[in-house]
């Protein structure tokens, strides 16, 4: 997965990313251990404002989407699109993706800008 030429708007000042990571059954704890090992590297990157994993919370609120026990949602905020691109290509991210690839079914990104 890479952030490539499809993202061409360079003048966006804050980038929000919601990464939905679907995991193989029973692999969430192992994935989160690897994820937490990489957090200090990511938060030290230039342009990182926020970066952290979240999991679905059972609330009983009627309009909530169904709870997914095999999903980790990563909430990110970056100072710029260039910072996000650099993050995606960082050596520690390449290494991290290699460590978790057998735990992951798929990753979907929402890349957002303030409205």
Name each model-derived stretch.
Residues 37-49, 68-110:
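An amphipathic, aromatic/His-enriched active-site/gating alpha helix that lines ligand/cofactor pockets
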Residues 8, 24, 86-89:
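Alpha-helix initiation/capping motif
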Residues 15-21:
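Active-site-flanking beta-strand signature of metal-NTP-handling nucleotidyl enzymes
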Residues 26-32:
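Short, conserved charged micro-motifs
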Residues 22-26, 78-79:
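Structural beta->alpha junctions
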Residues 28, 61-62, 85:
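A generic structural signal for short coil/turn motifs at secondary-structure boundaries
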Residues 2-13, 52-70, 95-115:
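Glycine-rich beta-strand-turn "strand-cap" elements at beta-sheet edges
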């Amino acid at each position: 997965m890479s952030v490539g030429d499809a993202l061409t708007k360079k003048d966006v000042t804050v980038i929000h990313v919601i990464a939905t990571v679907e995991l193989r059954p029973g692999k969430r704890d192992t994935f989160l251990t690897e994820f937490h090992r990489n957090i200090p590297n990511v938060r030290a990157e230039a342009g990182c404002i926020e970066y952290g994993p979240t999991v679905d919370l059972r609330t009983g609120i009627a309009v909530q989407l169904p709870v997914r026990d095999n999903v980790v949602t990563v909430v990110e905020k970056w100072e710029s699109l260039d910072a996000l691109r650099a993050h995606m290509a960082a050596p520690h991210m390449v290494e991290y993706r290699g460590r978790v690839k057998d735990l992951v079914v798929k990753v979907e990104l929402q890349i957002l800008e303030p409205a």
